[in-house]
Amino acid sequence: MLTQRPTLSDIRDARVRTESIVIKTPILTSEYFNDLLGMELFFKCENFQKTGSFKIRGASNAVFSLTDEEAKQGVACQSSGNHGGAIACAAYLKGIHADIVMAKSVSKAKIH
């Protein structure tokens, strides 16, 4: 758990840990919406990530930050969808166990 703000070094370390997992997604704009709203909008397309959301960024950084001893214990999270999928994906890629707890009311589309 973070007790202080991440440093530039922390951010660089996270990039190294996740560069083989996280996809460099495009930033797009829309002439239609720009004209409609009278301003230039930019859309970061994180939906192109392996798990369909930006959540893989933090999940893979957290999972790949674990020590060997911590990784042996596996990981767990509670989620309504995207975070759970990202933790499960990162754990799979690291070769460790993951328990994902989801409410019964979660949309079936969110369960991979």
Feature map (PLM): residue ranges:
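PLP-dependent amino-acid enzyme catalytic core
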Residues: 1-112
